[in-house]
């Protein structure tokens, strides 16, 4: 399966039990900042934004004072899982980032999608990739 198929079929799909509800944007990005696959709506990010995200995975709490920035959008960092998941909130939407062995799985959402639904979609794929050694 191509990386693009993972994004299209497992991240940008309808949320279980909520037909028509899906993430706003999603991507799989290598830990070096190279985009493996992304939705058409995923924001163009700056290298320093990706560096900040990787630093937060290695030094949990790094982004808390400044916020998480992606594509020029600032998210308030909320409870995640140190070294494994970063979650951010902005208004009625937010972001979930799951770290795997080699990549980062991104999901961005707006209402009516809930934070929990975004977490479920992103973390399920991230856990699967981890199980596959990726």
Curated annotation (Swiss-Prot):
Pfam families: Profilin (PF00235). A motif (Involved in PIP2 interaction) lies at residues 84-100. Disulfide bonds join 13-118. It is found in: Cytoplasm, Cytoskeleton. The modification Phosphothreonine is found at residue 114. One of its GO terms (cellular component) is cell cortex. InterPro entries: PFN, PFN_euk, PFN_sf, Profilin_CS. Its main location: cytoplasm. It comes from the Eukaryota. One of its GO terms (molecular function) is actin monomer binding. The keyword Protein biosynthesis does not apply. Keywords: Actin-binding, Allergen, Cytoplasm, Cytoskeleton, Disulfide bond, Phosphoprotein. Binds to actin and affects the structure of the cytoskeleton. At high concentrations, profilin prevents the polymerization of actin, whereas it enhances it at low concentrations. The variability of the residues taking part of IgE-binding epitopes might be responsible of the difference in cross-reactivity among olive pollen cultivars, and between distantly related pollen species, leading to a variable range of allergy reactions among atopic patients. Belongs to the profilin family. Occurs in many kinds of cells as a complex with monomeric actin in a 1:1 ratio. This is Profilin-3.
């Amino acid at each position: 399966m191509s990386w693009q198929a993972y994004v299209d079929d497992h991240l940008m799909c309808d949320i279980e039990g909520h037909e028509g509800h899906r993430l706003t944007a999603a991507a799989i990005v290598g830990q070096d900042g190279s985009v493996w696959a992304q939705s058409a709506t995923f924001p163009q990010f700056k290298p320093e934004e990706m560096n900040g995200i990787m630093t937060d995975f290695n030094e949990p709490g790094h982004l808390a004072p400044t916020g998480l920035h992606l594509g020029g959008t600032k998210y308030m960092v909320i409870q995640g899982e140190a070294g494994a998941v970063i979650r951010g909130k902005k208004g009625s939407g937010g972001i979930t980032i799951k770290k795997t062995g080699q990549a980062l799985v991104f999901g961005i959402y707006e209402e009516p999608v809930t934070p929990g639904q975004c977490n479920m979609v992103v973390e399920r794929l991230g856990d699967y990739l981890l199980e596959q050694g990726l």
